[in-house]
Amino acid sequence: LGYACGQEVVINFTPHLVPMYRGILVTAYASLTKDVTYEEVKAAYDACYENEAFVRVLDKDVCPQTKWVEGSNYVDVNFKIDPRTHRIIMMGAIDNLVKGAAGQAVQNMNLMFGFKETEGLLQVPMYP
């Protein structure tokens, strides 16, 4: 991240290990360098991911859940701003057997061979 930003970046990353057969939930924390509003960060998320077929930025106060991405190539993301600690809390959920493995491989193959990025990957998640 620091290389991409051209400056040092410090992020705490916490993968949550729970007794389930598929899915990864992650929380990452970073210090803010200035005061920002929810709307400013949401606009940045939306701009960053607007053309990403498999990234879903969730609505305000909705935390990603692994059951929402189970059996799919989607990653659900969201964030909260903690004004007490001047940190942003970023959350994400993937199905590690699809997005984290086979689905990611198919997505990369599609891009490498000039196929539509979403080819073979638009199955609907298993929930609800």
Identify the role of each PLM range:
Residues 74-128:
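NAD(P)-dependent Rossmann-like dehydrogenase/reductase catalytic/cofactor-binding core
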